[in-house]
Amino acid sequence: MIVGTGVDLAEVDRIQRSIERYGDKFIKRIYTPGEIAYVERKANKFERYAARFAAKEAGMKAIGTGWRHGVRWQDFEVANLRTGKPTLLLHGVAARYAEKLGVKNIALSITHTAALGMAHVILEN
């Protein structure tokens, strides 16, 4: 049964401007070391950062907390399975909220264009 869903769009140019303005301070505040390593070895890095930003926002919406209750950006991590399929890992406060919801499965779909990153998260128990 679906216990939460979230969707989000992130503008690539907005993420790019933030990275160019704040550099590593912005990147390390938002993204996990695994996400940074993945994106930095790929082409179209700003698009990939935007899609991961959208996934984090969609995850916050899906668990129903938004920014409240101590949820942090790095509580949500986009990782890729060996097949390349993206998955959303939860850590810290977000993981505890998901446990309270009885989440057993997290479905993540992400995509990006030159202009937008998009993500959709579905939580199931």
UniProtKB/Swiss-Prot annotation:
Binding site for Mg(2+): D8, E57
Entry keywords, A to Z: Cytoplasm, Fatty acid biosynthesis, Fatty acid metabolism, Lipid biosynthesis, Lipid metabolism, Magnesium, Metal-binding, Transferase
Enzyme Commission number: 2.7.8.7
Pfam families: ACPS
Highest rank taxon of the organism: Bacteria
A single GO BP: fatty acid biosynthetic process
Subcellular location: Cytoplasm
Record field: catalytic activity: apo-[ACP] + CoA = holo-[ACP] + adenosine 3',5'-bisphosphate + H(+)
Known cofactor(s): Mg(2+)
Any single GO CC term annotated in Swiss-Prot or TrEMBL for this entry: cytoplasm
Molecular-function GO term, any one: magnesium ion binding
Family recorded in the similarity comment: Belongs to the P-Pant transferase superfamily. AcpS family.
Function: Transfers the 4'-phosphopantetheine moiety from coenzyme A to a Ser of acyl-carrier-protein.
Record protein name field: Holo-[acyl-carrier-protein] synthase
Organism: Solibacter usitatus (strain Ellin6076)
Gene label: acpS
